[in-house]
UniProtKB/Swiss-Prot annotation:
The lineage of its organism: Bacteria, Pseudomonadati, Myxococcota, Myxococcia, Myxococcales. This is Histidine ammonia-lyase. Its EC number is 4.3.1.3. The gene is hutH. GO terms for molecular function: histidine ammonia-lyase activity. NCBIfam families: hutH, PRK09367.1. The modification 2,3-didehydroalanine (Ser) is found at residue 146. Contains an active site 4-methylidene-imidazol-5-one (MIO), which is formed autocatalytically by cyclization and dehydration of residues Ala-Ser-Gly.
Length: 508
């Protein structure tokens, strides 16, 4: 079956399209208008390179070496040396989806026509994507200005036949990967090395996939919370529209409406209409307020990313229409750094309130259910340590929620005296999202056990769909067993989208 094709024009790339390419589920093609812009900007660079006027990155050194003039005969070596010298990354390589997203995003910014790249070089990048040649990019080494220099240098190594790449998932020398794909490396001309390494695409690649995952986890948090509410015989009244209309934060209203859909047709709520309990704990009653605030933080990040992935973040920028090549600071990753910190904090709050709901479920004095939801408690410990694991993940998430965006370490002999730490923010946000996924999986698993004790009464339609899917993969726990596998099974339902799909189908 042929893959859908995404047109790259530098202006209209969507986050969801980035995910498609990251998963190798779509091919890419350069738009004709973008090709025209690329050729026009390259023509200006060629004219400047042929002249004697100094132009940063074309016939000068880089950073604090910008005042050093480079002889015309050395311009190719200048660009090659830039790539080689900046490939200083360390750590594990970016996962393949993030590395593909990185390559795509660099193609998109080059397609805007402000970088001065040659069509031959951009065509190689597009061919690499379509033939599954993915650069090996160590994930550590960027301070987020001048953009993501080290990660992008590792990306650019493959263009010149250096470094390493994955070809169809197999790691090998870059030159071999290109040969297997029927491609040839390029010799970089004036400015091309700089055009490949200057920008925010690494933090945006990690950030885009984090963003889409965070949006999914925000929905999962509502499902988990609704299941817990039903297992604890909680009230639906805190979610009525009137309460949220008088404090009209959009995220809060959205969560309340989502919870109402998940809880519709609940048999459990009718079973305790006249109970003596007056109010539920905050972790249940305040789900719209807490989950809603997290959603709004995540929505803020989406707005930033949607602009950034379609922005020219090179330096200098080539304005072919006015025949100017101008140095600026569009490579500075501060917008992304702030956005990624907000996502991490939002996900940590979802994990934190989830862990508190798990405590409500396993604590017999709060749940009026068997201690730790175990039959024959004492002999069996039930879900005691599942709550401890959740607490550990929340604690580490809180540490990782310290903002990277307020940090800065000067570099390049003081020329680059303020940096964004955007890649740091994105990477720690990714880790926080892993923890949030696990926390919510634990809550769903524990809530399913609680719902077993409420049978034959059934929860609302959405909660029931989630419960039944979980039970199709993980049986009720009659006696102690290794819970790691159960947590992983539910985590897989979360990551695959299967759980959300089941809930959405039931509540459509």
């Amino acid at each position: 079956m042929s893959r859908p094709r995404i047109l790259i024009d530098g202006d209209t790339l969507k986050l969801e399209e980035i995910l498609q390419v990251a998963r190798n589920e779509a091919t890419v093609e350069l738009s004709p208008d973008a090709a025209t812009r690329v050729r026009a900007s390259r023509a200006l660079v060629d004219r400047v390179a042929a002249g004697d006027t100094p132009a940063y990155g074309i016939n000068t050194g880089f950073g604090t070496l910008a005042e050093v003039r480079i002889d015309k005969k050395d311009l190719r070596d200048l660009q090659r040396n830039l790539i080689l010298s900046h490939a200083c990354g360390v750590g594990t390589p970016l996962p393949l989806p993030e590395a593909r997203a990185l390559l795509l995003l660099r193609c998109n910014v080059l397609a805007k026509g402000y970088s001065g790249i040659r069509m031959e070089t951009l065509a190689l990048a597009l061919d690499m994507l379509n033939r599954d040649v993915v650069p090996v990019v160590p994930e550590r080494g960027s301070v987020g200005a001048s953009g993501d220099l080290a990660p992008l240098a590792h990306l650019a190594l493959v263009f010149i036949g250096e470094g390493e790449a994955f070809y169809q998932g197999q790691r090998m020398p870059a030159k071999q990967a290109l040969e297997r794909a029927g491609l040839q490396p390029v010799v970089l001309e004036a400015k091309e090395g700089l055009a490949l390494v200057n920008g925010t695409q690494a933090m945006c690649a990690v950030g885009t996939l984090l963003q889409l995952r965070a949006e999914s986890l925000a929905d999962i948090a509502d499902v988990a919370g609704a299941m817990t509410l039903e297992g604890l015989l909680g009230s639906h009244k805190p979610f009525i529209p009137e309460i949220h209309d008088v404090r009209a934060h959009p995220g809060q209203k959205d969560v309340a409406a989502h919870l109402r859909r998940i809880l519709v047709d609940s048999e459990l709520v009718e079973s305790h209409v006249n109970c003596s309990k007056v109010q539920d704990p905050y972790s249940l009653r305040c789900m719209p307020q807490v989950h809603g605030a997290a959603r709004e933080g995540i929505a803020f990040s989406r707005r930033i990313l949607e602009v950034e992935v379609n922005s020219a973040t090179d330096n200098p920028l080539v304005f072919a229409d006015t025949e100017r090549i101008v140095s600026g600071g569009n490579f500075h990753g501060q917008p992304i750094s702030l956005a990624m910190d907000v996502v991490a904090m939002a996900l940590t709050q979802l994990s934190s309130i989830s862990e508190r709901r798990v405590e409500q479920l396993v604590n017999p004095s709060l749940s009026n259910l068997p201690a730790f939801l175990a039959k024959n408690s004492g002999l069996n410990s039930g879900f005691m340590i599942a709550q401890v694991t959740s607490a550990a993940l929340v604690a580490e998430s809180r540490v990782l929620s310290h903002p990277a965006s307020v940090d800065s370490i000067p570099s390049s002999a003081g020329r680059e005296d303020h940096v964004s730490m955007g890649m740091t923010a994105a990477l720690k946000g990714r880790q926080v999202s892993d923890f949030a996924r696990s926390c919510l999986a634990i809550e769903i698993l524990v809530a399913a056990q609680a719902l077993d004790f409420r049978l034959p009464l059934k929860p609302g339609k959405g909660a029931l769909a989630a419960y039944e899917l979980v039970r199709s993969k993980v049986p009720h726990m009659d006696k102690d067993r290794e819970l790691h596998r159960d947590i992983e099974a539910v985590s897989q339902l979360v990551d695959s989208g299967e759980l959300l799909a089941a809930v959405r189908s039931a509540t459509a």
